[in-house]
Amino acid sequence: MSIGRRLTASFAGIALTALAACDGVTGVGSRVEPALIIFYRDSSTIVAPDTVSRGEAFTVRIKTFGGGCTREAVRADVAIAGTLAEIRPFNRTQNANACTADLLFLYHTVQVRFDVGGRTVLRVMGEQRGASTGGTNGPALVERAIVVR
């Protein structure tokens, strides 16, 4: 085997070892958690039209909080019953010994459709962190009313 092939094989072995040891790259050692929607004095924003048409889907965009070991928006579950749409966003958090000390906004986009008219509510359910919860998270919700014609 030539020196070039031995070096290539050695570098490939080192790269595979490093990749296998890095949880952040492979996704191993992570957990999916309810998104943080209230962070101290800041609340998530719910971006949606003020008025929508009955039976027509529309886009809802939710800003959640991340940073540190939480760096990815994973999914948002939607359940609609009458005039209420419950949206539960989830983010991925890496299990790590050390994380960055930053704050990120992670966005979730969903489609919602109401089949009834009148005043309806978009309810985002997730977690909160603040002075009242200390270093742990607690349940939270943020709502926005819209009109269906």
Describe each model-derived feature in a short phrase.
Residues E127-L141:
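Short acidic/polar inter-strand loop motif in beta-rich domains
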Residues M1-D23:
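Sec-dependent bacterial lipoprotein signal peptides
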Residues L16-R41:
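Bacterial Sec-dependent N-terminal signal peptides
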Residues G55, V116-V121:
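Short tyrosine-centred short linear motifs in exposed loops/low-complexity segments
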Residues R88-F114:
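An anionic, turn-rich surface loop/hairpin at beta-sheet edges
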Residues V60-G67:
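Aromatic/hydrophobic beta-strand junction motif of beta-rich domains
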Residues V47-V52:
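Short beta-strand segments of immunoglobulin-like
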Residues R54-V60:
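Structural beta-strand segments of beta-rich domains
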